[in-house]
Amino acid sequence: MKPDAHQVKQFLLNLQDTICQQLSAVDGAEFVEDSWQREAGGGGRSRVLRNGGVFEQAGVNFSHVHGEAMPASATAHRPELAGRSFEAMGISLVVHPHNPYVPTSHANVRFFIAEKPGAEPVWWFGGGFDLTPFYGFEEDAIHWHRTARDLCQPFGEDVYPRYKKWCDEYFYLKHRNEQRGIGGLFFDDLNTPDFDHCFAFMQAVGKGYTNAYLPIVERRKAMAYGERERNFQLYRRGRYVEFNLVWDRGTLFGLQTGGRTESILMSMPPLVRWEYDYHPEDGSPEAALSEFIKVRDWV
């Protein structure tokens, strides 16, 4: 079947609705919607939940942008895109909980298509989800990765190991020599064997995110914590900011191509702290995190 951008867009809009409803049901607070238009073509729906019962901030952003020609930054690496009109659409979300025992989570699913008369369209899917704990719980990590593995299973035995490895490699802070979290799935440039197969996989990832995340939230949201845990959470959130502003391709692409800054930076934690030359106390739960987030096979 030939690529159907309209079908993908409808799925993404419905997915945004579903995820927001599921997060609101856990939190008790509602999302505020901000619809926006892009002068050069397209627009989106940004939804933010702030200072809820469970989530300090949760942002679920849908965007659909299109144009007559690709920006030079994109065609430099892919000369076959030159002279084509394009559509890019996706959902990107980040959840920052109040409780330091509840991990931060991120998910993204996206579709890109570039066309010109008389030529086959160039298209692909990308996406994934990853988890950033502040305090490590093995059962949470196993559940997260088991959910990821199980949703990949119908698409082939090699899919989960391949996309887990890609996730571990992508969410890595080179300047700190450490992982951002415990990973999950990451895929890009997916266009084989055909549109239907790739679209089905993207849908499985999009729907799988809340199955992976919400049971962990429910398990940890009522755990007692104090100033020490909160301070460590704010310190570790600094790594999230560093990754997004220094290494994340999506953030950089959005800012360099005149994307909507408020939506792009919606992933930022609302509060964060840095501390010069900080080292957690030996043997403390905080010190255990650096070992916990090292790459390993969780399932």
Swiss-Prot record:
One of its GO terms (molecular function) is manganese ion binding. Residues 240-275 are annotated as: Important for dimerization. Its EC number is 1.3.3.3. It catalyses: coproporphyrinogen III + O2 + 2 H(+) = protoporphyrinogen IX + 2 CO2 + 2 H2O. The record marks H175 as: Important for dimerization. Substrate binds at S92, N108, V109, R110, G258, G259, R260. Pfam families: Coprogen_oxidas (PF01218). Pathway: Porphyrin-containing compound metabolism; protoporphyrin-IX biosynthesis; protoporphyrinogen-IX from coproporphyrinogen-III (O2 route): step 1/1. Keywords: Cytoplasm, Heme biosynthesis, Manganese, Metal-binding, Oxidoreductase, Porphyrin biosynthesis. It is an enzyme of class 1 (oxidoreductase). Its cofactor is Mn(2+). GO terms for biological process: protoporphyrinogen IX biosynthetic process. The active site is at H106. GO terms for cellular component: cytoplasm. Mn(2+) binds at H96, H106, H145, H175. It is found in: Cytoplasm. The keyword Transport does not apply. NCBIfam families: PRK05330.1. HAMAP family: Coprogen_oxidas. Homodimer. Belongs to the aerobic coproporphyrinogen-III oxidase family. Involved in the heme biosynthesis. Catalyzes the aerobic oxidative decarboxylation of propionate groups of rings A and B of coproporphyrinogen-III to yield the vinyl groups in protoporphyrinogen-IX. This is Oxygen-dependent coproporphyrinogen-III oxidase.
